[in-house]
Amino acid sequence: GLPFDNGASVMAVRSDMIENAGLTVDDFKDLTWSEFEEKAQKVVDANGVPMLTSSGGSELIIEMMQSAGASPVVDGEVKIADNAALKESLTVYKDMVDKGILAEYTDWDQYIASMNDGKAAGVINGCWIMSSVQAAADQSGKWAIVNMPKLDGIDGATNYANCGGASWAVSSNCKNTELAFDFLKSTFGSSVELYDDLLPN
């Protein structure tokens, strides 16, 4: 296989809503989740909308765990007992929902609309979410990108994770694997220009 792109996690924030709370975008860089919640509450209070929007799935919880090098699956086995990063991630997530800092949407279109309609001051997801964030022309220049918060009290916690990405692969039933590998190598595997042309679109 051949890696194609990476969905590095980002936090996209509305700079205008942050400024309404007397804060700056820089105030949201390199935070722990407890520091984030404190600042996010000010944004919620100043704007009357949640700081973050979520698609209601496990993406954000997985990103939180991943940022600390943890996973709910270890060596192919589900590991939820004695998983400190999972426990802390769930605690933070629930706390944000309870405080109105995080809004959950189970419908993808509503999730995207919450960003575009000003119903949230930010979102954490893979960097691919930026195209959705940029869809509202009237918000041009009002969004900024920072790194995500890191878990408090968890060894190895960082402000970085991944959500998504893509790879090309040659299946085992390919009739001409050598030709297929050569195609991948000579196109996606060796052409920066092709990447530059494909990825923005």
Predicted regions and their residues:
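Extracytoplasmic/periplasmic substrate-recognition and gating elements
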Residues: A21, K99, A136-P200
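Short glycine- and hydrophobic/aromatic-rich loop-to-beta-strand nucleating segment
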Residues: S9-V13, M65, W168-V170
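Aromatic-glycine-rich donor-binding/catalytic loop that engages nucleotide-sugar donors
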Residues: D16-F28, K99-I101
